[in-house]
């Protein structure tokens, strides 16, 4: 028997002795490969912990009134209470419902489980727009390296900056820089400028967490909407009264 053949047989015998019968070979754990320009998938946003918008005197007074009305459970006639979309920037600045991102060379689409849909156009500019104002505004995007830069204008003034109480005007302008620093995270740096409501721009970075095991479920707004009780306060169908 040659030396090479003997060494090969010895090595094979060693493998058989060290690998328990019926046990799969151990494999090193590796992080999933990803492209920083590929945003497709299901993500969960996050709630704002501080509503520190730089309001001027007029809009600051309106904001404080809405805050107190919300604390007192007084009805507020916002679009969401009529099963309408929360619009921008609330879609990106609030949590509660996950959203799925679909992507092509022409358009990037954010679809939220509550029915809100945001489309970022990648092949045109704002010129020639004859619609509006719009709940989601007119969003135009382009790539700056691996960062998606989005410019949004032409927004309605009856939506909120977050869930339902923070006002803004139709002059609001949204700029975003969106990037994917790791497989499971997208970061969205949002800059809001509103010369009618703010004294200066407001900047905040939102973290979006990826969930590969999630899928969006059917949502019917009428099953979850607010309604007015006989005493004029608001409630949500199906929820037990909150003790006070």
PLM feature spans:
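PEST-like low-complexity, intrinsically disordered acidic/proline/serine-rich tracts
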Residues: 3, 19-244
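Intrinsically disordered, low-complexity terminal tails
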Residues: 2-3, 8
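Bacterial N-terminal signal peptides
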Residues: 8-19
